[in-house]
Amino acid sequence: MSRKQLALFEPTLVVQALKEAVKKLNPQAQWRNPVMFIVWIGSLLTTCISIAMASGAMPGNALFSVAISGWLWVTVLFANFAEALAEGRSKAQANSLKGVKKTAFARKLREPKYGAAADKVPADQLRKGDIVLVEAGDIIPCDGEVIEGGASVDESAITGESAPVIRESGGDFASVTGGTRILSDWLVIECSVNPGETFLDRMIAMVEGAQRRKTPNEIALTILLIALTIVFLLATATLWPFSAWGGNAVSVTVLVALLVCLIPTTIGGLLSAIGVAGMSRMLGANVVATSGRAVEAAGDVDVLLLDKTGTITLGNRQASEFIPAQGVDEKTLADAAQLASLADETPEGRSIVILAKQRFNLRERDVQSLHATFVPFTAQSRMSGINIDNRMIRKGSVDAIRRHVEANGGHFPADVDQKVDQVARQGATPLVVVEGSRVLGVIALKDIVKGGIKERFAQLRKMGIKTVMITGDNRLTAAAIAAEAGVDDFLAEATPEAKLALIRQYQAEGRLVAMTGDGTNDAPALAQADVAVAMNSGTQAAKEAGNMVDLDSNPTKLIEVVHIGKQMLMTRGSLTTFSIANDVAKYFAIIPAAFAVTYPQLNALNIMRLHSPDSAILSAVIFNALIIVFLIPLALKGVSYKPLTASAMLRRNLWIYGLGGLLVPFIGIKVIDLLLTVCGLV
């Protein structure tokens, strides 16, 4: 579920952004953006010249100088406004989260158990390791792990999802978030963070941009822009002696205007806004990124590790067939399978009970009346079952049942091996049922591949992204599902160690890897991956290891995360192309105007036939300022993103933003020149 989206130019945000834009005129704020700092210095310089001309201390056209100075200040203000508006939208999202934080008291237990004596303490004084009790109606005071109890929790303040979730001790659903509310029952929680370090605190800080640092690509682009600025600065500085030698020195005001129009002010003014907006769009998708670096890395990802269950398949495997071993009746197999599944509360276990009922009218037995011992599934045994009336029935993976049979002195039938292979080749998961040391047969669990997922993987392949399915299934089953889903590769019988090794292997090849995870066993791989999206429903260890948290706990969101990252990189690249292409048109406007008196031959470059030198220079400066405002919506929303190959994407952007960057200034400057002339302002 996504949060309510703010209007692009929300009136209250615009007013606040205008105030912030004025505040950002101070040198300390301007110094952070070298390109706009040059414009700021130029504004100061031309302002001083305008004052000197107006007072008669310097010769020259004071009105023209004032106009140039004014529009240079407007250019700086517009750049500040773009950044302030992006930050304001993020802060508005953060303010909605701050409402979740409430000053409250917590019941700190003296001993780590329910019913122990408790002290009432302010929630903001809880430290890591403290034990607290929360009951129905209470706000959970800190991030932590449930060590006792189970409860229904309302997490809508964090996730935006109204449906309550169950949090209980043990397993992957023991993690709770401060600021959420208990709806029923009680929990004993061990705090896992100190004050100011909660997930909500970090979420607010990241959204507000308080910890936003420039990403590597942003730094590289900034260095390029600085280099271009220095080149144009040196080139402009040489023009004064060049024109003076020709007998008619160009004024400092004109040289400043020329410099400002030639340096890449458009992307320089919007660069910070693009980065802030990228993180804001990520939050709009209910994903919290810990840094801009994480969002940027998402755009560069070329390998996606995707969990099969819930991402590629619907995740609700259902029993579809009983396949008896040679000499075993199918009803006998179904009866044993149902008995072994009576205490199995997983969807797979329930489906086995239902299939036996549908096929052979085997009614569910009363669990209590059986006086049986149920054997739960464990990661070590990889099987479950029941001990009843001297019968030892187990169901589990092929390898686990094989070991069980051999340990009990039995022999695993060759025909069952063939049936297991047959089931696996069909893309189903085989479960083997055994009674004592006698193998009864195989249950086929069929998982359904999500509709449209194959087409999405084809789009990712076009973009040069490799998809790898991660599953605990055996190789045959994994291969069948991988072929049906259209993934490029798969990792079968995956363990935490195997996932970690696979990520390192891809990274050693120079690739960037993205993955999702929710369990403590996923933490090492999440920490190693370049883009690691932890599920909000997962453990605290997983959330700390990842660099993003999906509040919806939807593994499929990883594909959307990559799209948002690529859109941010495309936006930055497109606007950089547009900004640099702009310079060509502004060159044709200002150079002839500035030097036409000294070198009349340069009039040949006045292809726009602008009215006069003053109107040409002023029109270029005005266009240079206004284009920033017109591009703010594009910087905040991002350019239109389509899954294309890198070469096709480059061609598309060059046509739209390269050619557009050349043509738009010619049209814009000419229109402004006509308006200035018609209004008699030049």
From Swiss-Prot:
It catalyses: K(+)(out) + ATP + H2O = K(+)(in) + ADP + phosphate + H(+). Mg(2+) binds at D518, D522. The chain crosses the membrane at residues 34-54, 62-82, 219-239, 254-274, 588-608, 616-636, 656-676. Keywords: ATP-binding, Cell inner membrane, Cell membrane, Ion transport, Magnesium, Membrane, Metal-binding, Nucleotide-binding, Phosphoprotein, Potassium, Potassium transport, Translocase, Transmembrane, Transmembrane helix, Transport. Part of the high-affinity ATP-driven potassium transport (or Kdp) system, which catalyzes the hydrolysis of ATP coupled with the electrogenic transport of potassium into the cytoplasm. This subunit is responsible for energy coupling to the transport system and for the release of the potassium ions to the cytoplasm. Belongs to the cation transport ATPase (P-type) (TC 3.A.3) family. Type IA subfamily. HAMAP family: KdpB. The system is composed of three essential subunits: KdpA, KdpB and KdpC. This is Potassium-transporting ATPase ATP-binding subunit. The gene is kdpB.
